[in-house]
Structures are given as C-alpha cells and as structure tokens.
C-alpha cells in the first residue's frame, strides 16, 4: 500500500484517534464503518476523514464503507502497536508521579519502564506500586543504553528542561514528550512533542467566552 510521506501534522495527530475509534468499532462487533460514522465518532466532518485516509492509498471503496478489522490492523501497524514500546520518564514531581501511575498499556502497548529525578530525590532508589524503578539522573546514560529505550517523557521545571533534554539525546533518546513550557533546541532527527496544560486551559476558556458572545 502506497503511503504519502508528506502527511500533514494535523492528520498525523489524528492517527491514534482513528486507531482508538476502530478498536471501539471492533469491540462493538461493527464490521463496516462509513466515513460519516467515523467522523461522528471523532467529532470532525466526513471530508476530513476522507482527506486523511487519502494519504494512505486505497483504504476503502466509495459506497462500501471501511473494513473495521482491516483498518484497525492498518493503524496498529502504522503506530507500531503490535509490540510493547518502553518509555522513560524524567521528573517525579506532581505530573511525573501521576504519569508513573497511569496505565498506558491498558489502551496501547506502551509503558513507562523507568523513572529518573535528581540523585537526592526521596523516590530515587525505590519502586512505584507497579514496580517501576526510580533512578538518579546521573545514571541516565547507562540505564538508557542498557534498556535500549528511544522515547522519553519530560516533566522537569522549565529551568532544567534543556539541560535534561541534552542528556537524554546524548544517551540515545530520539523522541521527547515535554510537559515543560519552553521550546527545546534539539538536533535534526530528534522529535519533540509539547504538552502545555496552561495553554490548553486558556484556549478552552477563550472558546467558552466566545460562545457566550
């Protein structure tokens, strides 16, 4: 199947949502789904669904709908969800601890397999209730290379985010999900996704205010 390499970022961000929808359809024993059904489940319009799917070649036939099992497996392959992806976390503050207890693997084959913080943090040398070990940041290079991990979640204060990101990249990390509200300078080939809770909340409040006008 031919896949267009120049997929827009907006489409790429919807891939995991499509996968989730098709898994839900499959669980509900739905065999075929129309673009309208998919769009309604996603909260978008049918044209967007068809445009997104066009980047991946022939996923369905007009008038016949989309084969749910086929599409579920397609997105599983695309998102590499057939094998477990181990992720590390740096920063065991409030957000970090919440993520350490979040069961990513209940929905997808991702799991936080180790956590890090400053060497004198009280959690260093312990394990979470789920058995995730917490190590000192000074040991991150050795642990990352031994575990062959390429993905990290960053939940450190903004004043330390760049320094820690540099350490992660030096250790071999290729992708970072950052909760720190600063833009990270990274080499070409390193992927960073940002989660800014304050910005998201402000955007929500803006739209709420607009809806009242």
From Swiss-Prot:
Localization (cell): Cytoplasm
Source domain of life: Bacteria
Keyword Repressor: yes
InterPro entries reported in the protein's UniProt record: CoA-bd (IPR003781), NAD(P)-bd_dom_sf (IPR036291), Rex_DNA-bd_C_dom (IPR009718), Tscrpt_rep_Rex (IPR022876), WH-like_DNA-bd_sf (IPR036388), WH_DNA-bd_sf (IPR036390)
Residue ranges: DNA binding: 17-56
GO CC terms: cytoplasm
Keyword terms: Cytoplasm, DNA-binding, NAD, Repressor, Transcription, Transcription regulation
One Pfam family hit: Put_DNA-bind_N
Coiled coil: none
Role this protein plays: Modulates transcription in response to changes in cellular NADH/NAD(+) redox state.
HAMAP family to which the protein is assigned, alphabetical: Rex
Protein name from the UniProt record: Redox-sensing transcriptional repressor Rex
Highest classification ranks of the organism: Bacteria, Bacillati, Bacillota, Bacilli, Lactobacillales
Gene: rex
């Amino acid at each position: 199947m031919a896949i267009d390499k120049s997929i827009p970022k907006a489409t790429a961000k919807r891939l995991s949502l499509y996968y989730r929808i098709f898994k839900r359809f499959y669980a509900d024993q739905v065999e075929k789904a129309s673009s309208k059904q998919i769009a309604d489940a996603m909260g978008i319009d049918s044209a967007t669904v068809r445009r997104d799917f066009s980047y991946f070649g022939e996923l369905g036939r007009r008038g016949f709908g989309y084969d749910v099992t086929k599409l579920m497996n397609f997105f599983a392959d695309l998102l590499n969800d057939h094998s477990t992806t181990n992720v590390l976390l740096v920063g065991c503050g409030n957000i970090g601890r919440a993520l350490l207890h979040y069961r990513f693997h209940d929905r997808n084959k991702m799991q936080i397999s180790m956590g890090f913080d400053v060497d004198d943090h009280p959690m260093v040398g312990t394990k979470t209730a789920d058995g995730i070990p917490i190590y000192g940041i000074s040991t991150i290079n050795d642990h990352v290379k031994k575990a062959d991990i390429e993905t990290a979640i960053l939940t450190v204060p903004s004043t330390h985010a760049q320094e820690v990101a540099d350490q992660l990249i030096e250790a071999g990390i290729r992708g970072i999900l950052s909760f720190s509200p600063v833009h990270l300078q990274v080499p070409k080939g390193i992927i960073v996704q940002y989660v800014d809770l304050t910005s998201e909340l402000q955007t929500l409040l803006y739209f709420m205010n607009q809806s009242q006008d």
